[in-house]
C-alpha cells in the first residue's frame, strides 16, 4: 500500500513539473456533502474503512464545477483503480491549480463523522425518552422570551403573542469525548432527528398549532446538553375582565406542559422566575405591566395518581384608554349635552319635544355603531356600557319631563281657569323660585286685577255712585235758582238729569236679577223706538202742572232703558274680569312650568356629571378597593 502511494505521488509530480506556479489547497465548496478524508491522516487506525468511504464519495461528485478538484483529491483512489495510468490534467489557470493541489488538512470530516456516529440508528432512537434509567425523570428546563403582544381579541377572548422559547434537557446518548473528536465542543442537529419533549400550549386557541412554530437546529454540547430554540406565534385563550373596560387591566396566562408525560417521566422546570423582556416591542393598545413565570403541579380528576407539572407565563397588561375616550366617550357626552338645549328652549316655540327626540335618536344610532367594539359577555357589564345606558336613560327622562312641563305650561288654558294649588304657589313659586334665583314679576294688568279682586270688585260701582250723587246735588242747586225766574220753567235737560240720577240710584240700590240676552234686546229695541220718536217730534217735557202725565211716561221708559244699559255694562265688566282672571291663572301656570323646567335642567346637569364621575372616574381611581368592587358587582 505504501509502495502504491509513492508511485502515484511520483507520477503526479512528473506530470505537473512544467507548470510554472505554486500549488495551494482548496477547501470544499459544498459543506453539506462533507466526506470523511481521515484516510489521509495517519493518526486514524481504521484507514482502510475510511478509504473505502472516500472512494465511494469520489465516484459520485456533487457538481461539475468541483469535479476536477474532487478528482485531484481522490487521486489515490483513482490510482488504485488505474495503477498504471497517469491522469492527464487539463489546462487550468494558476490559482485554481494551486488550490486543487493543497489536499492534506484542507477538509476536516470530523464533525460529520461525529454526526453520523451520534445519530447512527443502531445506537440512537429518537422516539425513546433520554434517561440513564427508565425510572428516572428527564429534567427539562423551560425559558420564555416575550417579543410582542400582537392582538387582544375581546370578542373571542384570545391573546396573540409572538414569543421565543428556550427548552433545555440532558441526553446522555448525545455526548462524546472532545479529545477524540478534534476538540469539538458543540454541534447543530436538525430538531426532527432527535428526541424532543412534547411541550405544548395547553390553552391553545388556534387549530393549526404547529403551523405557527418556526424551529431551528438543536444545539448539542459534548456533555449531552441539548438546547432547543424556536419562535412561535401563540394564540391563547384569555378570559377578559370587562368590568373596567376601557380602563381595564388584563391578566392572561400561557400554560405550557407535556401532553404525554407526567412528573415521573418529565420534570418540567424554569430557568428564571421572571420572563425575558429584553427584546420586547411595545404595543399600541396595551402597556405591559409585568410578566412572571410560575411552575405549578396539578392533578387532573381523571388521573388522580399522577402529577403534571405546568409552566404558567402570566402577562399583566394595562389598556391605553386614549383612543376610547376620544372615539367612544367624548361623542356620547356631547350628544347627551344636546339634551340640555331642550330645557332652555322656550315652550312657545313648540320645538322642545322635537329637540329631545332628535337627541334620543342620535344617541341610539351612535350606540348601534359602537356596539361591535364592546366585549360581548354576560359575566359583567363594562363601565362604558353602564355609561351608555345611563346617558340613554337620562335623555329618555328628559323627554318625559319636558312633556310634563309643556302640559303644565298649558294647564291654565286647558283646565278652563283652574287655579294653581296653594301649596304650589307657596313652595314652587315662592321658596323654589327664590332658591333657583328666578324673579317672578307680575305684569301690570294682573297686578291691577289682583287689587280689584281684593276689594271684591267694588271700585267701579262705588265710583259710579259717587259721580251720580255729585250730579244730583248740582241739579238741585240749579233747580232752586231757576225757580226764582218769572216763568218758573226750565229746559228739558234739568229734569232729565234729575230723573237720570234718581233712576240710576234706584237701579243700583235695587237687587234686580240679570235678564237674559233676548229680553234685553227686545226691551232695548222698544225703548229705542220711543226715544227716537221723542227726539224727531221735538217733544221736550217741561216741569209744569199740565205735563205730569207725559213726564211720568218718559220717566218710566227712560228708567227702563237705564237699567238695560247698566246691566250690559255689568255683564261686560264681568266678562273682562273673567278673561283677566284666566290670564292671571295661565300666567301662574306658565311661571310654575318655568320654575319646574329650571329645576329639571339643574337635575339633568347634576345627573350627567354624577354619572361621569361615578362610572368613569371613581372606579378607575379606586379599582383596587374592595368596597368599590362590591359596589360595581351589585350591577
Curated annotation (Swiss-Prot):
- Topology Cytoplasmic: residue spans: 402-599
Query: Which key words are in the record?
Result: Cell membrane, Disulfide bond, Glycoprotein, Ion channel, Ion transport, Ligand-gated ion channel, Membrane, Postsynaptic cell membrane, Receptor, Signal, Synapse, Transmembrane, Transmembrane helix, Transport
Q: Does the keyword Transport apply?
A: yes
Per the record, the major location class is membrane
Lineage summary: Eukaryota, Metazoa, Ecdysozoa, Nematoda, Chromadorea
Q: Which Gene3D superfamilies match?
A: Neurotransmitter-gated ion-channel ligand-binding domain, Neurotransmitter-gated ion-channel transmembrane domain
**Which residues point to the Extracellular side?**
25-324
Signal peptide location in the record?
A: 1-24
The terms describing its cellular component in GO are: neuron projection; plasma membrane; postsynaptic membrane; synapse; transmembrane transporter complex
Classification via SUPFAM superfamilies: Neurotransmitter-gated ion-channel transmembrane pore, Nicotinic receptor ligand binding domain-like
Name of the protein: Ligand-gated ion channel 4
Q: Please give the start and end residues of each transmembrane region.
A: 325-345, 355-375, 381-401, 600-620
Family, as annotated: Belongs to the ligand-gated ion channel (TC 1.A.9) family.
Biological process per Gene Ontology, one example term: monoatomic ion transmembrane transport
Q: Name one GO molecular function term.
A: transmitter-gated monoatomic ion channel activity involved in regulation of postsynaptic membrane potential
Q: How does it sit in the membrane?
A: Multi-pass membrane protein
- Domain of life from the UniProt record: Eukaryota
Transit peptide recorded as keyword: no
Q: Which PANTHER family match?
A: NEUROTRANSMITTER GATED ION CHANNEL
Cystine pairs annotated here are 238-252
Q: Which subcellular locations apply to this protein?
A: Postsynaptic cell membrane; Cell membrane
Amino acid at each position: 500500500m505504501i509502495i502504491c502511494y509513492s508511485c502515484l505521488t511520483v507520477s503526479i509530480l512528473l506530470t505537473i513539473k512544467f507548470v510554472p506556479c505554486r500549488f495551494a489547497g482548496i477547501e470544499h465548496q459544498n459543506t453539506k456533502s462533507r466526506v470523511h478524508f481521515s484516510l489521509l491522516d495517519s493518526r486514524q487506525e481504521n484507514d482502510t474503512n475510511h478509504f473505502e468511504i472516500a472512494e465511494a464519495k469520489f465516484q459520485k461528485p456533487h457538481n461539475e464545477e468541483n469535479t476536477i478538484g474532487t478528482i485531484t483529491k481522490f487521486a489515490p483512489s483513482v490510482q488504485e483503480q488505474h495503477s498504471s495510468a497517469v491522469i492527464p490534467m487539463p489546462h487550468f489557470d494558476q490559482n485554481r491549480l494551486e488550490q486543487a493541489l493543497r489536499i492534506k488538512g484542507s477538509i476536516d470530516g470530523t464533525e460529520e463523522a461525529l454526526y453520523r456516529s451520534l445519530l447512527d440508528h443502531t445506537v440512537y432512537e429518537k422516539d425513546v425518552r433520554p434517561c440513564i434509567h427508565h425510572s428516572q425523570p428527564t429534567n427539562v428546563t423551560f425559558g420564555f422570551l416575550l417579543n410582542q403582544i400582537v392582538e387582544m381579541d375581546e370578542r373571542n377572548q384570545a391573546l396573540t403573542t409572538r414569543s421565543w422559547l428556550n427548552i433545555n434537557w440532558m441526553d446522555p446518548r448525545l455526548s462524546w469525548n472532545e479529545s477524540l473528536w478534534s476538540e469539538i465542543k458543540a454541534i447543530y442537529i436538525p430538531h426532527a432527528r432527535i428526541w424532543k419533549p412534547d411541550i405544548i400550549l395547553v390553552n391553545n386557541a388556534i387549530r393549526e398549532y404547529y403551523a405557527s412554530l418556526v424551529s431551528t437546529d438543536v444545539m448539542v454540547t459534548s456533555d449531552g446538553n441539548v438546547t432547543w430554540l424556536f419562535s412561535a406565534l401563540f394564540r391563547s385563550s384569555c378570559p377578559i375582565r370587562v368590568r373596567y373596560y376601557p380602563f381595564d387591566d388584563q391578566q392572561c396566562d400561557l400554560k405550557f406542559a407535556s401532553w404525554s408525560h407526567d412528573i415521573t417521566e418529565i420534570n418540567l422546570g424554569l430557568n428564571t422566575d421572571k420572563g425575558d423582556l429584553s427584546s420586547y416591542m411595545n404595543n399600541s393598545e396595551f402597556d405591559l405591566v409585568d410578566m412572571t413565570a410560575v411552575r405549578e403541579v396539578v392533578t387532573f380528576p381523571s388521573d388522580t395518581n399522577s402529577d403534571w407539572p405546568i409552566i404558567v407565563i402570566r402577562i399583566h397588561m394595562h389598556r391605553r384608554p386614549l383612543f376610547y375616550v376620544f372615539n367612544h366617550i367624548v361623542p356620547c357626552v356631547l350628544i347627551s349635552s344636546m339634551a340640555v338645549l331642550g330645557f332652555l328652549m322656550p315652550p312657545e316655540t313648540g320645538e322642545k319635544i322635537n329637540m329631545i327626540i332628535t337627541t334620543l335618536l342620535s344617541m341610539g344610532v351612535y350606540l348601534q355603531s359602537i356596539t361591535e367594539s364592546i366585549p360581548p359577555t354576560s359575566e359583567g357589564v363594562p363601565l362604558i356600557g353602564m355609561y351608555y345606558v345611563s346617558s340613554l336613560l337620562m335623555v329618555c327622562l328628559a323627554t318625559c319631563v319636558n312633556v310634563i312641563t309643556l302640559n303644565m305650561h298649558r294647564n291654565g288654558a286647558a283646565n278652563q281657569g283652574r287655579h294653581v294649588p296653594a301649596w304650589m304657589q307657596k313652595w314652587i313659586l315662592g321658596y323654589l323660585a327664590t332658591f333657583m334665583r328666578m324673579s317672578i314679576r307680575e305684569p301690570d294688568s294682573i297686578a291691577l286685577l289682583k287689587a280689584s279682586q281684593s276689594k271684591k270688585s267694588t271700585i267701579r260701582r262705588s265710583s259710579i255712585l259717587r259721580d251720580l250723587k255729585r250730579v244730583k246735588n248740582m241739579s238741585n242747586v240749579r233747580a232752586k235758582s231757576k225757580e226764582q225766574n218769572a216763568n218758573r220753567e226750565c229746559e228739558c235737560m234739568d229734569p232729565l238729569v234729575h230723573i237720570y240720577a234718581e233712576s240710576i240710584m234706584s237701579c243700583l240700590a235695587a237687587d234686580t236679577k240679570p235678564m237674559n240676552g233676548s229680553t234685553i234686546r227686545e226691551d232695548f229695541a222698544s225703548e229705542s223706538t220711543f226715544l227716537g220718536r221723542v227726539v224727531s217730534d221735538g217733544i221736550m217735557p217741561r216741569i209744569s202742572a199740565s205735563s205730569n202725565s207725559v213726564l211720568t211716561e218718559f220717566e218710566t221708559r227712560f228708567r227702563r232703558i237705564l237699567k238695560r244699559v247698566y246691566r250690559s255694562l255689568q255683564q261686560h265688566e264681568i266678562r273682562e274680569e273673567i278673561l283677566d282672571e284666566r290670564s292671571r291663572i295661565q300666567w301662574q301656570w306658565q311661571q310654575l312650568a318655568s320654575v319646574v323646567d329650571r329645576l329639571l335642567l339643574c337635575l339633568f346637569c347634576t345627573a350627567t356629571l354624577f354619572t361621569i364621575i361615578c362610572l368613569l372616574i371613581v372606579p378607575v381611581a379606586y379599582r383596587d378597593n374592595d368596597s368599590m368592587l362590591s359596589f360595581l358587582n351589585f350591577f
